């Protein structure tokens, strides 16, 4: 079963890399980013984490995915306020909402920290 799930992970990673916005974020609607054009940091954090983890574990080629990870990480760091608050986090709900820079949730911060832990490991290589 391991190889089966690894193949799914690689396919999902490739698709997600192609859906990254020009601004570095993944938006609330992956297939129609214009419907929710504002940044979305919780998804971006989780995706950056997943891709960086794959690079660190040797599952994903760094030459292909490192530029995507760096662009996503740069986007995430732009969303951190001077007081440390992470903004642009989609609220819990049944469907996407328009978000603003001052909107945050704990899981957004968690996603940021998970991404940071893998970025740190990348920087150590």
Give residue spans per PLM region:
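Short, surface-exposed loop/turn motifs that are enriched in glycine and acidic residues
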Residues: 2-6, 33-44
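CBM-like carbohydrate-recognition segments
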Residues: 38-125
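Oxyanion-binding "anion nests"
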Residues: 1-31
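Short linear capping/connector segments at secondary-structure termini
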Residues: 26-34, 90-95
């Amino acid at each position: 079963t391991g190889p089966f799930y690894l193949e799914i992970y690689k396919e999902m990673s490739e698709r997600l890399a192609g859906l990254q916005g020009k601004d570095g974020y993944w938006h609330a609607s992956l297939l129609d980013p214009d419907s929710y054009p504002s940044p979305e940091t919780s998804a971006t954090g989780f995706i950056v984490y997943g891709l960086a983890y794959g690079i660190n574990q040797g599952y994903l080629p760094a030459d292909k995915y490192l530029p995507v990870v760096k662009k996503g990480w740069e986007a995430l760091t732009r969303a951190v306020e001077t007081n440390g608050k992470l903004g642009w986090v989609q609220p819990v709900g049944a469907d996407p909402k328009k978000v603003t820079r001052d909107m945050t949730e704990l899981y957004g911060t968690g996603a940021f920290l998970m991404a940071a832990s893998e970025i740190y490991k990348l920087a150590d290589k």
